[in-house]
């Protein structure tokens, strides 16, 4: 699936480079747009192998309005990491849009910056 992108590639590359199994890795999900704020279209659902024609909530996607869903980005990252065999996954609870006192957010303020996440050996 196209939506797996960097997480899938990162786990595979780290395991190839170190000879470890995915179960020997740990992941920390940094701050990001939260599931109550991240509105996406059908293209994003398709990229993660979901059916945009469905009218019910699908794992990590909740219908919001016609053609729009709320996406759980940390949930999607956890899903991809778990599917690859990574079992120790932490973080992902801080929403950059909702917490203006601690985080910048392009969607909220049109200000760019960087956040961090990590996948490493245990």
Task: Map each language-model feature to its residues.
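Active-site microenvironment for binding and transforming phosphate-containing groups
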Residues: 1-122
């Amino acid at each position: 699936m196209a939506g797996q992108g960097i997480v899938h590639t990162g786990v595979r590359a780290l395991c190839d480079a170190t000879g470890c199994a995915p179960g020997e890795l740990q992941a920390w999900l940094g701050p990001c747009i939260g599931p109550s704020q991240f509105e996406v279209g059908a293209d994003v659902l398709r990229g993660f192998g979901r059916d945009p024609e469905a009218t019910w909530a699908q794992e990590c996607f909740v219908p919001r309005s016609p053609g729009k869903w709320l996406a759980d980005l940390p949930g999607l990252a956890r899903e991809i990491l778990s599917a690859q065999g990574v079992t120790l996954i932490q973080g992902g609870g801080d929403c950059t849009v909702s917490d203006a006192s601690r985080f910048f957010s392009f969607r909220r303020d049109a200000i760019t910056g960087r956040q961090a996440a990590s996948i490493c050996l245990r």
